[in-house]
């Protein structure tokens, strides 16, 4: 009897100790489907679980350290673009929180999983770079590293949401939710997916 009481107490302790994003979304049941991006999308419950996407970490001090930043925080930071939004982290956190609530209402899935799927689907795998010095310049197709795929995906997703919300009756949180849901499905309604296909098409032409 004492043993079962101890087990119950242990389970209760685990439940109370679990860190959930905005006290709602669990990190335990999320996974990264693309094996090459596992090390670059920070969602491990032991390392990256936070109540709010604001860790105040110094991720830009050293090269590649930003790969250790929780992925939801990277999305939040990327929303603080265009001069008038610089440094408004509280606003960015609020946008992400509302977008996650909308995603949960529309898709009934864990919004953290939707964000991960959107990033996996939106990162281009091939790009064209300029080769040659002054005079003759040609473009050559190159593979993209996993970290740059994640960086590009986050940039394209937030850019798409920002452009959709500009001069629109919809709030940016609604636009971000739509963008993430469409990108997670791989739908061409997503700005990020369209841009990714365009980048890969140009690269294919320059192989």
From Swiss-Prot:
Listed GO biological process terms: translation
Record-listed N-acetylalanine modification sites: 2
PROSITE patterns with a match to the protein in the record: RIBOSOMAL_S7
Keyword Cytoplasm: no
UniProt organism field: Arabidopsis thaliana
CDD domains xrefs: uS7_Eukaryote (cd14867)
Keyword field: Acetylation, Ribonucleoprotein, Ribosomal protein
Any one GO MF annotation of this record: mRNA binding
UniProt-recorded name of the protein: Small ribosomal subunit protein uS7z
Keyword Ribosomal protein assigned: yes
Tissue specificity note: Expressed in epidermal cells of root tips, lateral root primordia, root hairs and shoot primordia.
Family: Belongs to the universal ribosomal protein uS7 family.
Matches recorded under PANTHER family: RIBOSOMAL PROTEIN S7 (PTHR11205)
Pfam families: Ribosomal_S7
Gene Ontology annotations for the cellular component aspect, listed alphabetically: chloroplast; cytosolic ribosome; cytosolic small ribosomal subunit; endoplasmic reticulum; plant-type cell wall; plant-type vacuole; plasmodesma
């Amino acid at each position: 009897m004492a043993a079962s009481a101890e087990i119950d107490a242990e389970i209760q302790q685990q439940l109370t100790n679990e860190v959930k994003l905005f006290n709602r979304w669990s990190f335990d049941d999320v996974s990264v489907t693309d094996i090459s991006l596992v090390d670059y999308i920070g969602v491990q419950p032991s390392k990256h679980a936070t109540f709010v996407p604001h860790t105040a970490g110094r991720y830009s001090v050293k090269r590649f350290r930003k790969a250790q930043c929780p992925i939801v925080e990277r999305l939040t930071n990327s929303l603080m673009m265009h001069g008038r939004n610089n440094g408004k982290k509280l606003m960015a956190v609020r946008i992400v929180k509302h977008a996650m609530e909308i995603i949960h209402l529309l898709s009934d899935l864990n919004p953290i999983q939707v964000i991960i799927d959107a990033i996996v689907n939106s990162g281009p795998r091939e790009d064209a770079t300029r080769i040659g010095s002054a005079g003759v310049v040609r473009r050559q197709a190159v593979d993209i590293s996993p970290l740059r795929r994640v960086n590009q995906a986050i940039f394209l997703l937030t850019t798409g949401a920002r452009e959709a919300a500009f001069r629109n009756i919809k709030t940016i949180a609604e636009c971000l939710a739509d963008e993430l849901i469409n990108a997670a499905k791989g739908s061409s309604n997503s700005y990020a997916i369209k841009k990714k296909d365009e980048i890969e098409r140009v690269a294919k032409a320059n192989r």
